[in-house]
């Protein structure tokens, strides 16, 4: 055993110790024990050889041991070991509570850990345990059991007793044993522990250097490294199931485990030197879970005069693998983030374009809405004007009817008196003047219509011409020619005047020259 230890059997091992233990040949007990033998660890004082003690025969006994003579000094728990079970157990002796009338084996096994009623139930629950050292503890145990030579078969289902080597399936509590071949736990084990294979102590000859591979990955609480000679794995829900391997690395377990120390995170190589041998431990197995730092199990029937191997801190192996996987994960995450960023930028660009179009359409709609509103106001005004005009026309029509009503009796009176009234000269002139006024009025109306037509024609002709109309193009060409001809005419008139002036000057000079010639020759 290594580390801070309150109990355990075996030879003095490496660690912090203040005394030299005697060589013990009793069967070791591992687990949660307050009785200390000659083991290494944090001890003050050295116990003597263990004395024999009679196991208790009560149903719930506290394993009263025969105290041995102690040496003087300041010691912590130097109780002697009995040939029976050690540790904190309830009813380790002959069980009074037996499920079948079977005889208990005379040789008591080493109940490991915290055992409740470790009676020998051989035929009660359809399981047979054949062991050279003793019967494996049954019941609710928290520690690994002893090493068994012959494999035993266990029935599947809900079992409280475990065979030595068979693979129990289902809900299993306290099933333990050894197997020649390593198996991996299939479900949630609570304490897969590996017994330590340590180097020989000072009282034994040189032993071969055992090499075991154990690795612990995950959160292990107060866990230490122990080498494993053999391994046995259980399937199902097990509490404190030891895992021992023979020549092969133990498989990793995952889940909540009340495991014994013997698991380290990563791959580590540790060399511890005892009196005659060197143990090199290379961790390769991995266990993940929640560990409560139970002590490793020493094989039953083998003296524990061995030195425990101390494991170095976990190496960078597992961290490197995890870093590689995490780096790949980060790269994939970065690529996904970049892809999503590009897609987001593209979508944002499209969204901005569509938002710009929608904004333009919204402005157009707002402007058109304002125009429609103003047009509606104008239409309302026109409707009001039309209503007033209709009222005025109705008023005029009513006045005209009244006037006609007033004129009709007067016309009748005039017709009655027409035969007696003679037309005078003034009346004839008035009639002519009236007819002339009617003619002038008709002519004015025609002139107004003609002026209206002329104005409309001028408006249509003054409008910008259509450039695509060929007539308009021809008109433009003709206008350009006309302008050119006018310019030529104006310039030709100027040239004509200049030519006439030059001609006059030439004629005058010619006459002067002729006159001078005549004077000279005369």
Curated annotation (Swiss-Prot):
<dbReference type="GO" id="GO:0051028">
    <property type="term" value="P:mRNA transport"/>
</dbReference>
<feature type="coiled-coil region">
    <location>
        <begin position="328"/>
        <end position="458"/>
    </location>
</feature>
<dbReference type="GO" id="GO:0051425">
    <property type="term" value="F:PTB domain binding"/>
</dbReference>
<dbReference type="GO" id="GO:0045893">
    <property type="term" value="P:positive regulation of DNA-templated transcription"/>
</dbReference>
<dbReference type="GO" id="GO:0045742">
    <property type="term" value="P:positive regulation of epidermal growth factor receptor signaling pathway"/>
</dbReference>
<dbReference type="GO" id="GO:0043130">
    <property type="term" value="F:ubiquitin binding"/>
</dbReference>
<dbReference type="GO" id="GO:0090543">
    <property type="term" value="C:Flemming body"/>
</dbReference>
<dbReference type="GO" id="GO:1903438">
    <property type="term" value="P:positive regulation of mitotic cytokinetic process"/>
</dbReference>
<keyword id="KW-0945">Host-virus interaction</keyword>
<dbReference type="GO" id="GO:1990904">
    <property type="term" value="C:ribonucleoprotein complex"/>
</dbReference>
<keyword id="KW-0225">Disease variant</keyword>
<dbReference type="GO" id="GO:0008285">
    <property type="term" value="P:negative regulation of cell population proliferation"/>
</dbReference>
<dbReference type="GO" id="GO:0046578">
    <property type="term" value="P:regulation of Ras protein signal transduction"/>
</dbReference>
<dbReference type="GO" id="GO:0046580">
    <property type="term" value="P:negative regulation of Ras protein signal transduction"/>
</dbReference>
<keyword id="KW-0813">Transport</keyword>
<keyword id="KW-0677">Repeat</keyword>
<dbReference type="Pfam" id="PF05064">
    <property type="entry name" value="Nsp1_C"/>
</dbReference>
<feature type="region of interest" description="5 X 2 AA repeats of F-G">
    <location>
        <begin position="6"/>
        <end position="143"/>
    </location>
</feature>
<dbReference type="InterPro" id="IPR026010">
    <property type="entry name" value="NSP1/NUP62"/>
</dbReference>
<keyword id="KW-0963">Cytoplasm</keyword>
<dbReference type="GO" id="GO:0005737">
    <property type="term" value="C:cytoplasm"/>
</dbReference>
<dbReference type="GO" id="GO:0007098">
    <property type="term" value="P:centrosome cycle"/>
</dbReference>
<dbReference type="GO" id="GO:0043069">
    <property type="term" value="P:negative regulation of programmed cell death"/>
</dbReference>
<keyword id="KW-0597">Phosphoprotein</keyword>
<dbReference type="GO" id="GO:0046601">
    <property type="term" value="P:positive regulation of centriole replication"/>
</dbReference>
<feature type="glycosylation site" description="O-linked (GlcNAc) threonine">
    <location>
        <position position="373"/>
    </location>
</feature>
<dbReference type="GO" id="GO:0072686">
    <property type="term" value="C:mitotic spindle"/>
</dbReference>
<dbReference type="GO" id="GO:0006606">
    <property type="term" value="P:protein import into nucleus"/>
</dbReference>
<dbReference type="GO" id="GO:0007080">
    <property type="term" value="P:mitotic metaphase chromosome alignment"/>
</dbReference>
<feature type="region of interest" description="Required for centrosome localization">
    <location>
        <begin position="328"/>
        <end position="458"/>
    </location>
</feature>
<comment type="similarity">
    <text>Belongs to the nucleoporin NSP1/NUP62 family.</text>
</comment>
<keyword id="KW-0539">Nucleus</keyword>
<feature type="repeat" description="2">
    <location>
        <begin position="44"/>
        <end position="45"/>
    </location>
</feature>
<dbReference type="GO" id="GO:0090398">
    <property type="term" value="P:cellular senescence"/>
</dbReference>
<comment type="subunit">
    <text>Component of the p62 complex, a complex at least composed of NUP62, NUP54, and NUP58. Interacts with NUP88. Interacts with NUTF2. Interacts with HIKESHI. Interacts with OSBPL8. Interacts with CAPG. Interacts with SAS6 and TUBG1 at the centrosome. Interacts with MCM3AP isoform GANP.</text>
</comment>
<keyword id="KW-0509">mRNA transport</keyword>
<feature type="region of interest" description="Disordered">
    <location>
        <begin position="260"/>
        <end position="288"/>
    </location>
</feature>
<feature type="modified residue" description="N-acetylserine">
    <location>
        <position position="2"/>
    </location>
</feature>
<dbReference type="GO" id="GO:0003682">
    <property type="term" value="F:chromatin binding"/>
</dbReference>
<dbReference type="GO" id="GO:0060236">
    <property type="term" value="P:regulation of mitotic spindle organization"/>
</dbReference>
<dbReference type="InterPro" id="IPR007758">
    <property type="entry name" value="Nucleoporin_NSP1_C"/>
</dbReference>
<dbReference type="GO" id="GO:0045840">
    <property type="term" value="P:positive regulation of mitotic nuclear division"/>
</dbReference>
